[in-house]
Curated annotation (Swiss-Prot):
A cellular component annotation (GO) from this entry: nucleoplasm
Domain BRCT: 354-455
GO BP terms in the entry: maturation of 5.8S rRNA from tricistronic rRNA transcript (SSU-rRNA, 5.8S rRNA, LSU-rRNA); maturation of LSU-rRNA from tricistronic rRNA transcript (SSU-rRNA, 5.8S rRNA, LSU-rRNA)
Protein name, as recorded: Pescadillo homolog
Amino acid sequence: MGRLKQKGKAGAAKNYITRTAAVRKLQCSLADFRRLCILKGIFPREPNNRKKANKGSSAPTSFYYAKDIAYLAHEPVLKRLREHKAFAKKLSRALGRGEWSAAKSLEENKPIYRLDHIIKERYPTFVDALRDIDDALCMVFLFATLPSTARLPREIIDNCARLSMQWQLYVMHTNSLRKVFLSIKGVYYQAEVMDQTITWLVPYQFTQNIPTDVDVRVMLTFLELYQTLLGFVFFKLYSDANLVYPPPLDINKDDMAAGVGAFNLQSTHVQPKRNETGKTVDVDGKKVSVKDVRQTIKSIVAADEPQVDVQMGDPDEASPGEEEQFVAHASKSAPDAVPELPTLHMLSSTPSSPSSRLFAPYTFWLSRETSRSIFEFIIRSHGGRVGWPASSGTGSPFDESDESITHVIIDRPVVQKEETPAERELRSRRKYVQPQWVVDSINAGKILLEDTYAQGKLLPPHLSPFGEYEGAYDPTAATNDADMDVETDGEEGEADASGDEKESNTDAVEAALASVAMDDPASVRAAELAAEAAGLDYNIFETKVKKASKSKKPDTASKATEEAEKDMNKMMMSNKQRKLYEKMKYSQQKKAAEKEKLEQRKKQLQKAGGK
């Protein structure tokens, strides 16, 4: 006979542990426990039977896996937190006694912890980390716009701003931006990096205030993890693109509000000059130094790559590079040299979408009322050149009088004023469009007509490029055939009156048969009279009736069978699954009703516009 199981020693009571017991086992404070759970990715679990998991108690509490808590007990960060607690006591005691030298020594040796090992544990591969940076980017861009307070140090905000600009630099360099949506919350961006779709939200540049009901400590813990994660990801992305990470920052340009232009992207093949003091070796009676050997190797393997700069150059210098493409040929001086084959890093950094260089032939000028940070990033990510006035910051590659400007992004009403012939000629050579034209062109994947978005005109609706769900309402899609027939009946009736009258009558009879019930003789008789009035042959009408009855019978039978199967499946569900199923059905019906309401409103607006 087997040994009897004691109550609370097996099953759910052993697999789960309450939060109070976990804090007691780890011997840490509740704040440190929350920080550990956030950093390690441990979250509360829901046991099947809460009463059994809580050893007979029905008091509300949070449960965790016992193995997760045992995993936390060996965490190096927990050890550092305990050391920091002891350090805080020693520092407080030294300050209370006035031992300033001891307090200074303690401050210099303050225990710190690193999160590198946690990033490696949570993200074994680079693709796993890349898929999880959406929230990290949103958090970093949010904190980059917040003001510094006592709870939010200035160093954290500066680091978030630096990380956000490094990400924008990479997206602009690789032309990875795919979709943009200007919403009430902010600007939604979607980029495609190494075949992974990354979406993030950037708030508008307004003065932000931290709400009092927001727990900043929890957000700072997430931010601490995300900053370390982005550092790993950016280093890998920059290395694969043959760029130096972190990119050098020009302090003078940064102080003058140059934005992303304060950073310089440098290729890893361009090495800084330094004095070569190596040994000299005699080769065939000639003295050869280490510098000569390196130069010879570089000339054989490949030519030096020039420095890459995010700032746009002059139009005369940029146009030949856009028109001509370099084609690798075998060297005449070294016929044995083989042309370099494309590698995975080259292919991953190459734009995969034809719309990624959408604005390459154009030069834009941003008016002072447009957001420079948004449209500079959008336009440069698609190969365009952009300039701005001095009031928007320094670093503009050209001024407003430049002859190469093709589009002016302006967001102000038209003001009638006297223009000189030179100003009139300059205006005729440029397209003055509203900012929405840039975003809609990117989402459409082509250059839209500028007349619709001209200065002062009523703009078309700005639609989200992100698909919500299958079967969602699409304002750009045409209505169904019946709606189109109703709308175009008055327009096309006169033009096609002498055309295919029989075909239109046949279609009308088919529509009537589809709407009537075949088991109702009165309805069939009414359809027969309508066919006779339309001049339709009786044999053709009989054929239509048989076809309609055949098409309706299987539909009715299949619908009844489907409903019966659904009822049987619901009977086999548990109570929890049935409630979840009912919630799903309710949400689907609600979405369908909302879609039908929007379609009806669209039809009414179209009819009102037609009148």
